[in-house]
């Protein structure tokens, strides 16, 4: 009787290597899957390690272009920022990796998938919801949520002992006092010493960006061209170097922004499962793109459309963070936001300098900015006398509020009691 097949999302690290061995002990045939989304990984060494442990095969899939074009670029186009700060680098990678994982699972006839995500994190949710949306009949083995596995492996020391007994190669390098997840879009850091929010992240943690205090004294200036909200070309203005391929654009902006310390954030965020967590993120290139895209949006879109679009983008950011990239509500909101991007085309010049990115100019054939109307030098077609009636109409409710609540309300507003001062 043939063994049931499991496709394991494999990283080559201690956790998934031990899970691979443990699955083999449970009498499964295990195929390992690795997605190359731009992380610094020795895939050849990881493949050799998995085969040595006992994997039936190792599939390594280059997904960098797919990730940037189908996930990162749409996220910029939609303006997705979770809780107004996190640019979703890890969250976007999970549905991308899940797509590759499920494609291989179907091709290789796997009844199960397995992963090494912990039971407290967001990744377990993102992976599994994405996989169920793509293949409803797939079954999931999540060892870190299984009582027998968790009782056997209480932590890293138990895994190391198991690896030693099972002849699983373990890296001799000292483990960093934090965990890291990297891809072509960003690097995230959490856990370890970062679990104390009062402790500042050490400078040696950062790998994509250097401290703004050590940044060059000359700014890097680039022109970014957008078409329907998507970046299509970037030109470094000093050298004239031009990039059009999405991964090349992102690589250039990561390097240029990183040299100036652009895109560092240290935040506490709300996980979907209800916990708060502290994360440190480096996202230089996409930080630059978001800045340029937002500026062009304001230049080209109606004010009320912008407000509705911002509301929808916030909802979509929640969907992505929580693992619902492939959900019907996300698909619906995506289509609504894309309607707003039809005229977000033009070019934006940005200046990256010592931790900051600033837009210095913008041009678009679809701009709603009317220089003659906006000018303080000429009246143009705008009658300043019309403002009198506008002010009068908008003052009606304020006058009525004062008529009813009047002096007593104002006295309370401007008074300060001793207890009030203690709160300030």
From Swiss-Prot:
Binding site for L-citrulline: 86, 91, 122, 126, 179, 188, 269, 281
EC number: 6.3.4.5
GO molecular-function term, one example from the UniProt record: ATP binding
Binding residues annotated for ATP, in chain numbering: 9-17, 35, 114-122
GO terms for biological process, alphabetical: argininosuccinate metabolic process; L-arginine biosynthetic process; urea cycle
Stored InterPro entries: Arginosuc_syn_C (IPR048268), Arginosuc_syn_N (IPR048267), Arginosuc_synth (IPR001518), Arginosuc_synth_CS (IPR018223), Arginosuc_synth_type_1_subfam (IPR023434), AS_cat/multimer_dom_body (IPR024074), Rossmann-like_a/b/a_fold (IPR014729)
Keyword Glycosyltransferase among record annotations: no
Keywords linked to the UniProt accession: Amino-acid biosynthesis, Arginine biosynthesis, ATP-binding, Ligase, Nucleotide-binding, Urea cycle
Keyword RNA-binding applies: no
Catalyzed reactions: L-citrulline + L-aspartate + ATP = 2-(N(omega)-L-arginino)succinate + AMP + diphosphate + H(+)
Residue numbers binding L-aspartate: 118, 122-123
GO annotations of cellular component type: cytoplasm
Pathway as given in its UniProt record: Amino-acid biosynthesis; L-arginine biosynthesis; L-arginine from L-ornithine and carbamoyl phosphate: step 2/3; Nitrogen metabolism; urea cycle; (N(omega)-L-arginino)succinate from L-aspartate and L-citrulline: step 1/1
NCBIfam families: argG (TIGR00032), PRK00509.1 (NF001770)
Recorded family membership: Belongs to the argininosuccinate synthase family.
Quaternary structure annotation from Swiss-Prot or TrEMBL: Homotetramer.
Name this protein carries in UniProt: Argininosuccinate synthase
């Amino acid at each position: 009787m043939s063994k049931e097949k499991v496709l394991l999302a494999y990283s080559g690290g201690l956790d998934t290597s031990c899970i691979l061995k443990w699955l083999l002990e449970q009498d499964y045939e295990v195929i390992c899957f690795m997605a190359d989304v731009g992380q610094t990984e020795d895939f050849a060494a990881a493949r050799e390690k998995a085969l040595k442990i006992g994997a039936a095969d190792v599939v390594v899939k280059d997904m960098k272009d797919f990730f940037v074009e189908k996930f990162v670029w749409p996220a910029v186009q939609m303006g997705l920022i979770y809780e107004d700060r996190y640019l979703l680098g890890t969250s976007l990678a999970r549905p991308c990796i899940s797509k590759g994982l499920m494609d291989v699972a179907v091709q290789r006839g796997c009844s199960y998938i397995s992963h090494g995500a912990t039971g407290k994190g967001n990744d377990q949710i993102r992976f599994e919801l994405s996989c169920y949306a793509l293949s409803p009949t797939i079954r999931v083995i999540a060892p870190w949520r299984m009582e027998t596995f968790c009782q056997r492996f209480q932590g890293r020391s138990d895994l190391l002992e198991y690896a030693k007994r099972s002849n699983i190669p373990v890296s001799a390098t000292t483990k960093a006092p934090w965990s890291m997840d990297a891809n072509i879009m960003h690097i995230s850091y959490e856990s370890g010493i970062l679990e104390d929010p009062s402790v500042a992240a050490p400078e040696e943690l950062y790998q994509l960006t250097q401290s703004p205090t050590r940044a060059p004294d000359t700014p890097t200036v680039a022109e970014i061209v957008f078409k329907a909200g998507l970046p299509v070309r970037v030109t470094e203005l000093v050298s004239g170097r031009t990039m059009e391929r999405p991964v090349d654009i992102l690589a250039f902006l990561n390097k240029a922004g990183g040299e100036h310390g652009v895109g560092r954030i240290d935040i506490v965020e709300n996980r979907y499962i209800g916990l708060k967590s502290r994360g440190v993120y480096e996202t230089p290139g996409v930080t630059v793109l978001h800045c340029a895209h937002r500026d062009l949006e304001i230049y080209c879109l109606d004010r009320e459309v912008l407000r509705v679009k911002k509301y929808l983008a916030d909802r979509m950011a929640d969907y992505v963070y929580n693992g619902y990239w492939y959900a019907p509500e996300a698909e619906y909101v995506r289509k609504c936001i894309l309607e707003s991007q039809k005229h977000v085309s033009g070019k934006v010049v940005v200046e990256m300098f010592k931790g900051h990115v600033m837009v210095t100019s913008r041009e678009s054939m679809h701009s709603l900015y009317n220089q003659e109307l906006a000018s303080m030098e000429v009246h143009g077609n705008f009658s300043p006398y019309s403002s009198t009636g506008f002010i009068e109409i908008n003052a009606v409710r304020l006058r009525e509020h004062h008529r009813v609540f009047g002096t007593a309300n104002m006295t309370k507003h401007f008074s300060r009691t001793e207890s009030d001062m203690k709160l300030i």
